[in-house]
Amino acid sequence: KLKWGTNMKVKVAAKINLMLDILKRLDNGYHSLFMIMQSVDLYDTIMVEENTENRSIIKCDTEGVPCNEKNIAYKCANAFFKACNIENQGITIEIEKNIPMAAGTAGGSADGAGVLYCLNKIYKTNLTTTELAEIGATVGADIPFSLTGGTAIALNTGNVIAPVKDLPECYIV
């Protein structure tokens, strides 16, 4: 059991696709992809803290963001608890949005990745980034990349990440 007052706050980055190639359609309806992704200097802030409700609560400062079980951050919290066989004794996830919604910049996935990172630290489960990415991939294709950031090649449905040398600082229009 956690002690009351346990909380953590992180900034999570948006991403852009520098390249996306659809290789083939998979039997499950998804597509096998080859992508080059880059995190960018646009961030949401995620705070995870205990509550006394024995359930996950989502709070967000932006209209239109679902504050219920449809939220990717909420889904990631549930996936974490299930994968780690931990009873959710109550957490509040507060999202401060700066990454635009539905813009293809992985705002929801970044939020979910931030929740996984925070819960791993708060609950001291010591999962590796690869293990967190496996949990995240059950929720969304961009979550594994959002856990690592930087510049990376993403394969399959986005669940296989291979970091590459960072791009030089530049402007993208």
Set out the residue ranges of the language-model regions:
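DPxDG-like acidic metal-binding loop motif
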Residues: 73, 103-129, 145-147
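Solvent-exposed beta-strand sheet faces enriched in polar/charged residues
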Residues: 19, 49, 59-61, 92-96, ...
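Short, Lys/Arg-enriched N-terminal segments with co-localized hydrophobic residues
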Residues: 1-7
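Phosphate-handling active-site elements
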Residues: 81-92, 118-135
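ATP-dependent small-molecule kinase catalytic core of the GHMP/sugar-kinase superfamily
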Residues: 9-11, 17-35, 125-173
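Short pre-catalytic strand/loop immediately N-terminal to key active-site residues, enriched for Gly-Thr
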Residues: 34, 91-104
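N-terminal beta-alpha supersecondary unit
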Residues: 9-89
